[in-house]
Amino acid sequence: MTNNLTLICDSVEYNGYPHANIKINDSIVYSGIVDDCKNKFDIPIPSGAGMHTLSIQRYGKTEKNISSDCEQILKVNGILIDGVAVPKHILVDNSKFEFNHIVNHGSLDFYPNGTWIFCFQTPFITWCMDQKISHDAKFNNNYLLPWSYQLGPNQADQLIYDIDQLFEKLEVIHD
């Protein structure tokens, strides 16, 4: 069984469209021009638990593709895994663009030649929820329990209190 990843790109043409090698787990799934006609890529990914890497190696940009007012650009507009959009904050938190020994974390626009890398894990929904918990924990100390991602501030404490009250009632009934 395989899962499906859909990569949606955009490009800005200037004396030609950007060229790219698109890889999943170091296997090339597309090599060529990314333009208005070819900007959506359906990529099968192996199912089962494991880490995966989507990479886009941009190449072929020269001085002819740059001017003072315009430049050739390649952009990642979105990624869907099994039809579910990867939230932008997860894309930004788990991606980087490397060029000329420089690493830019969270960049979704590629101006120079270089390699963009997005690391993710399957099963995707579990990994996505873990990423949401980690992201929310940066801004809210109340997200301490793994299942509390769907609870708002202080709701985990209230839920624990309600459960304790139910146990007390059960003890009274049992005695």
Model regions and ranges:
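Activation corresponds to long, low-complexity, non-globular regions
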Residues: 1-3, 13-15, 86-175
